[in-house]
């Protein structure tokens, strides 16, 4: 085996060993047996919500345990694969592809070990609002929504759009959607902040360069254990007809719902479900998420906590997307750069997410 091949394999083996110490496969295996016993109890479904939590956790832990076991087996098999290839014809290209695949999978698993926050395993609510920049900012907000939904689709995660407020000329004023799947909040929460776009404006007949901003807010989906109870008297409910681009009505009934939380002034709208009841339920989920985040901010006394909301303008951006006069996406916190903005805008943001998660971990450790 070539020395450089052996060295990289040894490094991956060491990284996986560190991951195993953090995730503890034996404890995971014990937890699987415990959950399987609960799932086999016929009385479990007397409480459907608890039953759903048990089956969901069981499925998740089983999948993670299989992933670790499979990676360990593949690392142990790789030297044999290389040895056989060298003995037959010396072509180790298949083994090299396997090594590259293992490197990618282990890097991704290593990042997941950094998602240990209280809410990191949750699904994510994403709010996008256009900021400074007029019609270009509205168009930019819609481009960001497309970027995140494309990323979710590529990774097999369902997206439910709760609300879109369209701008008059082009783009959107705001959008709210949920990305389903384990650890979506932990991964996507690093996207929170002001995103800056520099390009030749397609809306300027003189073809001038335009800078525009959009704000991204990421919240964890609220679960029953969070105890976010909202008295009916604290919420004003308004209903209206759903509208589409240009303000056109897309529904003949008042199915869209606007919730106003009277004590805080927080407003949430939802118009994409088929009925008023469904829209109200979806809007309530988002309102609960916002109130949970407000509660966390108060407890931690941090004005820049998750979901605090910022000013999408100069001096507040966390990432720049430059399409002119050169091509580059640069995260201003991590200094991670991508020289193909279109690829990023098409949903290829894994590198940016990983860099953000590693940066957040380093910041957390340095603050201790």
UniProtKB/Swiss-Prot annotation:
The modification N5-methylglutamine is found at residue 248. Keywords: Cytoplasm, Methylation, Protein biosynthesis. GO terms for molecular function: translation release factor activity, codon specific. The keyword Protein biosynthesis applies. It is found in: Cytoplasm. It comes from the Bacteria. Transmembrane segments: none annotated. Methylated by PrmC. Methylation increases the termination efficiency of RF2. The keyword Protein biosynthesis applies. GO terms for cellular component: cytoplasm. Gene3D superfamilies: 3.30.160.20, 3.30.70.1660, Release factor. Its main location: cytoplasm. NCBIfam families: prfB. Belongs to the prokaryotic/mitochondrial release factor family. Peptide chain release factor 2 directs the termination of translation in response to the peptide chain termination codons UGA and UAA. This is Peptide chain release factor 2. It comes from Corynebacterium glutamicum (strain ATCC 13032 / DSM 20300 / JCM 1318 / BCRC 11384 / CCUG 27702 / LMG 3730 / NBRC 12168 / NCIMB 10025 / NRRL B-2784 / 534). The lineage of its organism: Bacteria, Bacillati, Actinomycetota, Actinomycetes, Mycobacteriales.
